[in-house]
């Protein structure tokens, strides 16, 4: 804790020191996407396309059935947080497709 005032008593008591800045531990990077992983996943997505449940979820998102899409994905994937992340990913894909279609016209 950084000392604000050189006092003998109270919350701010003690000798004034500069805090050591430690670099974050290696275990903190778990789950962060690397460039290589992102490249591989994008390549696989380009080759394989979307799974059938993802296509159906995208159809639900197209007709603004966001809650129904979330429930559907949660049933297929298993957890609420992963389903929310998948729904967000698919809605971003739809937005990109819409943007590309508008740019082409």
Swiss-Prot record:
<comment type="similarity">
    <text>Belongs to the eukaryotic ribosomal protein eL36 family.</text>
</comment>
<dbReference type="GO" id="GO:0005840">
    <property type="term" value="C:ribosome"/>
</dbReference>
<dbReference type="InterPro" id="IPR000509">
    <property type="entry name" value="Ribosomal_eL36"/>
</dbReference>
<keyword id="KW-0963">Cytoplasm</keyword>
<dbReference type="GO" id="GO:0006412">
    <property type="term" value="P:translation"/>
</dbReference>
<dbReference type="Pfam" id="PF01158">
    <property type="entry name" value="Ribosomal_L36e"/>
</dbReference>
<protein>
    <recommendedName>
        <fullName>Large ribosomal subunit protein eL36</fullName>
    </recommendedName>
</protein>
<comment type="subunit">
    <text>Component of the large ribosomal subunit.</text>
</comment>
<dbReference type="GO" id="GO:0003735">
    <property type="term" value="F:structural constituent of ribosome"/>
</dbReference>
<comment type="function">
    <text>Component of the large ribosomal subunit. The ribosome is a large ribonucleoprotein complex responsible for the synthesis of proteins in the cell.</text>
</comment>
<keyword id="KW-0687">Ribonucleoprotein</keyword>
<keyword id="KW-0689">Ribosomal protein</keyword>
<dbReference type="InterPro" id="IPR038097">
    <property type="entry name" value="Ribosomal_eL36_sf"/>
</dbReference>
<dbReference type="GO" id="GO:0005829">
    <property type="term" value="C:cytosol"/>
</dbReference>
<dbReference type="GO" id="GO:1990904">
    <property type="term" value="C:ribonucleoprotein complex"/>
</dbReference>
């Amino acid at each position: 804790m950084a000392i604000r005032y050189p006092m003998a008593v109270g919350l701010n008591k003690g000798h004034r020191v500069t805090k050591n800045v430690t670099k974050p531990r290696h275990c903190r990077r778990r789950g962060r996407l690397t460039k290589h992983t992102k490249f591989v996943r994008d390549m696989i997505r380009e080759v394989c396309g979307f799974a059938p449940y993802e296509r159906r979820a995208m159809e639900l998102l197209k007709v603004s059935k966001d809650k129904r899409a979330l429930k559907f994905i949660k049933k297929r994937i298993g957890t609420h947080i992963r389903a929310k992340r998948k729904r967000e990913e698919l809605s971003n894909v739809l937005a990109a497709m819409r943007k590309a279609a508008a740019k082409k016209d």
